[in-house]
Each structure stands twice: as C-alpha cells, then as structure tokens.
Amino acid sequence: MDYTASCLIFLFIAAGTVFGTDHETRLIGDLFANYNKVVRPVETYKDQVVVTVGLQLIQLINVDEVNQIVSTNIRLKQQWRDVNLKWDPAKYGGVKKIRIPSSDVWSPDLVLYNNADGDFAISKDTKILLEYTGKITWTPPAIFKSYCEIIVTYFPFDQQNCSMKFGTWTYDGSLLVINPERDRPDLSNFMASGEWMMKDYRCWKHWVYYTCCPDKPYLDITYHFVLQRLPLYFIVNVIIPCLLFSFLTGLVFYLPTDSGEKMTLSISVLLSLTVFLLVIVELIPSTSSAVPLIGKYMLFTMVFVIASIIITVIVINTHHRSPSTHTMPPWVRKIFIETIPNIMFFSTMKRPSQEKQPQKTFAEEMDISHISGKLGPAAVTYQSPALKNPDVKSAIEGIKYIAETMKSDQESNKASEEWKFVAMVLDHILLAVFMTVCVIGTLAVFAGRIIEMNMQE
C-alpha cells in the first residue's frame, strides 16, 4: 500500500514538472516569436526607456599607484521595463518569472567611461530575471579596472578620491534615462581590505553636453569613493626601521673616540641603511608627480647618517691633534673648556685646567744658573771640593736639561689633553643635538599629517 502511494506521489510531481516546463517553453516561444532585441522597448519612438542603476561593491582588489589603476569587483544592478515582454500568468500555468540569457533581450549599452584596460562593455554572460509585467532585473558581476588619479604627497598617510563613471554610449537623454537606485553604492557585502578603508562613498547623476552633440545631453551616474590607506604595514616595516637607524646614528657620538670604532659604526649604519632602502624601494610609489612623506623621511635619514659621518671625522681629527700640528685658539679654550662644560653640567668631568700641578723638580727648586766662571779666594773662605770637579758641574747641567725636557713634555701632554677634552665636549653636544634633531625631524615630517587626519575624523 505504501509503495503504491509513493509511486502515485512521484508520478504527480513528475507530471507537474513536465507541465510546468511545457508552460515555460510555450511562454518563451510566444514572447520571442516576433521580438527584436535591437529595438528600444517603448510604445512610441518618443517614449524614454527609464533604467535604474545600482552598484554593489564586493571587493577592492588592488590600487596600483604607479599606473593609477583601481581594480574592483562589483555587481551592477540594472532594472528597466520591456513593453514587448509582458504576459498573463493565468494563460501559462501561473508562471510569473522566467530567467533568460541577457543576450536575447534589449539591454542598455552602459559602459565604464574611465576604464583603464580597454574593456568598456559589461559582460553579457549572465541571465536576466524577467517578470510578467515586463520588468527586467539584470545584475551582472564584473571586475573593472578604472583610472584614478593617485596623489602620493602624504603617502603612507594618504587618502585617495576615486570614481567610477557609468553612462550610455549611444543613447542620449531623450531616448534613455538612467537614475541611481539610491544616493550611495551598496556596501552590504563589501569585503574589507587589509590596506584600504572605505571612508566615504556617494553617487551623483550628471547631464553632460558633449562637443559632438551639443543639442542633446547624455546622462551618466558617477560613484565616488574616498579611500584611506591603513598605514600600519608601512609604519612597522619602513618608518620604525628608519627611526632606529637615526637613533643608532646618534649613538656614534656616545662611543669613546679612543675605542677606534666610531667610523666603523658610522659606515656600518650607512651600509645597512643603503641595503634597507634597496629592499623597500618597491613598496614606495615610483611617481614623479610629488615626493611622498615616506620618501622625504628616508631622504632625511640618509642625510642624517651622512652628516654624522662627516662630523665624526671632524671629532676624530680634533681628538688626535697635538701642539706640534695645531695650536689651540683662545676662543676654543674659552668656549669648549671653560664655558660649555659649566652650561651642560659637566661638573664631574675632569678638565685639564683642574688637574693638580706637578711638583717642582730639582732644577726648579735649585737655581744653578749662577754656577759658571771662577770663584775667587776672596769670595768664600771655604769651597767644596765637589764644585771644583768638572764632572759634578756637567751632572748639574744634565739635570737641568732633563727637567726642562720633562716640563716641555708635560706642557705638550697638557695641550693634547685639552684637544681630547674639546673632542669629548663635542661628542656630548652632538649626541644631544642629533637625538633632538632625530625626534624633531620625525615629528616635522609626519606629525602635521597625522594631526590633520585626526581632525578630519
């Protein structure tokens, strides 16, 4: 019994399907018997075809800054009414909707005006939804490459204003009218990008008179998108490494000159920065329209490192000066030994002028310059036998020479220590200056734009 009932139900469903298919086949045959897809679907020639256009943005695929091309995945919804494709559902088994290839019916010749790859037309490989009232809904998916003027002045903290302009290619406003479905594109199914954020989006309808046809307007719908770049990737991979290179450059002046590694560290930083710039150059838009912020900062970092190398050479040269090659000018001693250490609180630094005076030598305590000539018997009543000895006198002269030589060496060492002290003061000054310039330079390049972006939000 159950088996018989199941067979009857199956036969009933199969028969309904056959009859339904038969109704749809008959309907399509009747609709397209005398249908001409080239002719506009209007009652009279003066009537206008009204097309409602809606854009649904699915994905922002790519923004090519170099070629100024934006690739997007969209669905372009188009609705219009075809007076030649109406029917009475009661005559066709209650069929109210059918799906037919878009190439079999008349469709508006909408194109993307600012197309960048030469493929202006919309693909017709999808089907349309046709209702018994003659209303047609066509939502073909498409990947468009549109031209967008990319302004890289504030890269990577930049915003781009891009647009997509859709309009008919041959029908003027007297034959075909296009209206936007709403004042904004549909982003309900938009897949967020890891590099860009959709900050604002709108659409406008324009009536344009072209020079070829000045008497009749052509309509277009333009969708505007404001794209804001997400700068985290560039902050982590470009800006922070450049900032660390700058700080490392400043630390060159914290390294003692006697270590002999100042130039080694400076050259190593320069080589590392050069290799780093070669690696990240592909991340920066290669355009000559403007110098991006990140390009300015990289140039600042390069100049910063080169300046540190030049100044390091001067500091090392100052450190190794001696009285035999350079005489310290009074103003240098006044500024770098007496004035600046007090201003910069170098109270714990041992200065050459504060060193203990060496104890007097035998030659300084004993004036032997009068030991010359002959001593008469009337001068003294007693004369030491040692003074009569020429060897003793020669020894005293030798001691005097040694004392003068030691004094000259002490003065030379003191002058060398003064030059080293000047070099050390320069190192401390330059350390503070370079660290300050590093911070101020970074803020000067990026702070203004970041504040402006926060104010806009």
From Swiss-Prot:
Pfam families: Neur_chan_LBD (PF02931), Neur_chan_memb (PF02932). The gene is chrna1-b. One of its GO terms (cellular component) is postsynaptic membrane. Glycans are attached at residue 161. Upon acetylcholine binding, the AChR responds by an extensive change in conformation that affects all subunits and leads to opening of an ion-conducting channel across the plasma membrane. PANTHER family: NEUROTRANSMITTER GATED ION CHANNEL. Disulfide bonds join 148-162, 212-213. It catalyses: K(+)(in) = K(+)(out); Na(+)(in) = Na(+)(out). This is Acetylcholine receptor subunit alpha-1-B. It comes from Xenopus laevis. One of the alpha chains that assemble within the acetylcholine receptor, a pentamer of two alpha chains, a beta, a delta, and a gamma or epsilon chains. It comes from the Eukaryota. The keyword Membrane applies. Keywords: Cell membrane, Disulfide bond, Glycoprotein, Ion channel, Ion transport, Ligand-gated ion channel, Membrane, Postsynaptic cell membrane, Receptor, Signal, Synapse, Transmembrane, Transmembrane helix, Transport.
